[in-house]
């Protein structure tokens, strides 16, 4: 008798995706982050669902409802901090996942890569709107500053901002719609994840060497299922101390002050995972230029496949490109640090230098180094 997992209409989809899926035998731990992101998404949806049962999206009660969750709801503090720090873990895994794709040339699967970029934008939008919901000082002013950037768009900018706000300032209407979208977007993200996996399974996984691995494949289960479970345990080991011992480590103290439109915090800044993009935005004196640079800092990933001129897919055997890649990582760390600093000397010039280097490395230096490596291959 044939196994039910291979014949049942629903189970055979799961089987071909997670059980009998042929996978390259050489996948390293860098291939764990896809499954870790799936776990993060699941945790965020579950904790978010329970938080939404107690949260009220009204300017008069939003801040107090979050306090109520932490103080009065059974394990409400755990739900709240799992959700907040789970988002940080989500972005750590996201950035490592994208970095893996850049390093090993996974972007040559252009459909999977482009859906991934769309996913990155969707998750960033979700996180931004979620940060507004506790209705603290940084929530309010962060929402005001970031949405106000759209006013830089010629002709329609001002009308667009007021349309998003639902009035002439960030107020009750803004909070209500942000809550609605924050609730909806994770389900859209889940649908996009399925499309992402669909495109990935059309081509099969890349591997660290970047060489086709068709002759050397192993079944996903049990080899990679057990490896993924180890990944989950490692992530949980990192997340648990953060949530249980220092849950506010990555947050902003200003967000424990209720939103007050008449008092501006000394330094308005987003959550740590947006600081690199925020630094790029601030490094350009022109408002529209800053907004374009902000969008391009992520959208630049879409043109990476076009800029791939190397004869080798992966950076595994390309030491010059490896050096440049890690230099890019250092630039991103610098931008993240600068994004959290006040706008004054010497931070301004450091931010501007790092921003120029970020675009310079991706647009010019990477392709140039690849061409040099191609030339060296002839020797």
Curated annotation (Swiss-Prot):
<feature type="transmembrane region" description="Helical">
    <location>
        <begin position="113"/>
        <end position="133"/>
    </location>
</feature>
<keyword id="KW-0830">Ubiquinone</keyword>
<feature type="transmembrane region" description="Helical">
    <location>
        <begin position="288"/>
        <end position="308"/>
    </location>
</feature>
<dbReference type="InterPro" id="IPR036150">
    <property type="entry name" value="Cyt_b/b6_C_sf"/>
</dbReference>
<comment type="similarity">
    <text>Belongs to the cytochrome b family.</text>
</comment>
<feature type="binding site" description="axial binding residue">
    <location>
        <position position="97"/>
    </location>
    <ligand>
        <name>heme b b566</name>
    </ligand>
</feature>
<comment type="function">
    <text>Component of the ubiquinol-cytochrome c reductase complex (complex III or cytochrome b-c1 complex) that is part of the mitochondrial respiratory chain. The b-c1 complex mediates electron transfer from ubiquinol to cytochrome c. Contributes to the generation of a proton gradient across the mitochondrial membrane that is then used for ATP synthesis.</text>
</comment>
<feature type="transmembrane region" description="Helical">
    <location>
        <begin position="226"/>
        <end position="246"/>
    </location>
</feature>
<dbReference type="InterPro" id="IPR027387">
    <property type="entry name" value="Cytb/b6-like_sf"/>
</dbReference>
<dbReference type="InterPro" id="IPR016174">
    <property type="entry name" value="Di-haem_cyt_TM"/>
</dbReference>
<dbReference type="GO" id="GO:0046872">
    <property type="term" value="F:metal ion binding"/>
</dbReference>
<dbReference type="GO" id="GO:0005743">
    <property type="term" value="C:mitochondrial inner membrane"/>
</dbReference>
<keyword id="KW-0813">Transport</keyword>
<keyword id="KW-0812">Transmembrane</keyword>
<protein>
    <recommendedName>
        <fullName>Cytochrome b</fullName>
    </recommendedName>
</protein>
<keyword id="KW-0999">Mitochondrion inner membrane</keyword>
<keyword id="KW-0496">Mitochondrion</keyword>
<dbReference type="GO" id="GO:0008121">
    <property type="term" value="F:ubiquinol-cytochrome-c reductase activity"/>
</dbReference>
<feature type="binding site" description="axial binding residue">
    <location>
        <position position="182"/>
    </location>
    <ligand>
        <name>heme b b562</name>
    </ligand>
</feature>
<keyword id="KW-0479">Metal-binding</keyword>
<dbReference type="InterPro" id="IPR005797">
    <property type="entry name" value="Cyt_b/b6_N"/>
</dbReference>
<keyword id="KW-0408">Iron</keyword>
<dbReference type="InterPro" id="IPR048259">
    <property type="entry name" value="Cytochrome_b_N_euk/bac"/>
</dbReference>
<dbReference type="InterPro" id="IPR030689">
    <property type="entry name" value="Cytochrome_b"/>
</dbReference>
<feature type="binding site" description="axial binding residue">
    <location>
        <position position="196"/>
    </location>
    <ligand>
        <name>heme b b566</name>
    </ligand>
</feature>
<feature type="transmembrane region" description="Helical">
    <location>
        <begin position="77"/>
        <end position="98"/>
    </location>
</feature>
<dbReference type="InterPro" id="IPR048260">
    <property type="entry name" value="Cytochrome_b_C_euk/bac"/>
</dbReference>
<feature type="binding site" description="axial binding residue">
    <location>
        <position position="83"/>
    </location>
    <ligand>
        <name>heme b b562</name>
    </ligand>
</feature>
<feature type="transmembrane region" description="Helical">
    <location>
        <begin position="33"/>
        <end position="53"/>
    </location>
</feature>
<feature type="transmembrane region" description="Helical">
    <location>
        <begin position="320"/>
        <end position="340"/>
    </location>
</feature>
<dbReference type="InterPro" id="IPR005798">
    <property type="entry name" value="Cyt_b/b6_C"/>
</dbReference>
<dbReference type="Pfam" id="PF00033">
    <property type="entry name" value="Cytochrome_B"/>
</dbReference>
<dbReference type="GO" id="GO:0045275">
    <property type="term" value="C:respiratory chain complex III"/>
</dbReference>
<keyword id="KW-0349">Heme</keyword>
<keyword id="KW-0679">Respiratory chain</keyword>
<feature type="binding site">
    <location>
        <position position="201"/>
    </location>
    <ligand>
        <name>a ubiquinone</name>
    </ligand>
</feature>
<keyword id="KW-0249">Electron transport</keyword>
<comment type="subunit">
    <text>The cytochrome bc1 complex contains 11 subunits: 3 respiratory subunits (MT-CYB, CYC1 and UQCRFS1), 2 core proteins (UQCRC1 and UQCRC2) and 6 low-molecular weight proteins (UQCRH/QCR6, UQCRB/QCR7, UQCRQ/QCR8, UQCR10/QCR9, UQCR11/QCR10 and a cleavage product of UQCRFS1). This cytochrome bc1 complex then forms a dimer.</text>
</comment>
<keyword id="KW-1133">Transmembrane helix</keyword>
<feature type="transmembrane region" description="Helical">
    <location>
        <begin position="347"/>
        <end position="367"/>
    </location>
</feature>
<feature type="transmembrane region" description="Helical">
    <location>
        <begin position="178"/>
        <end position="198"/>
    </location>
</feature>
<dbReference type="GO" id="GO:0006122">
    <property type="term" value="P:mitochondrial electron transport, ubiquinol to cytochrome c"/>
</dbReference>
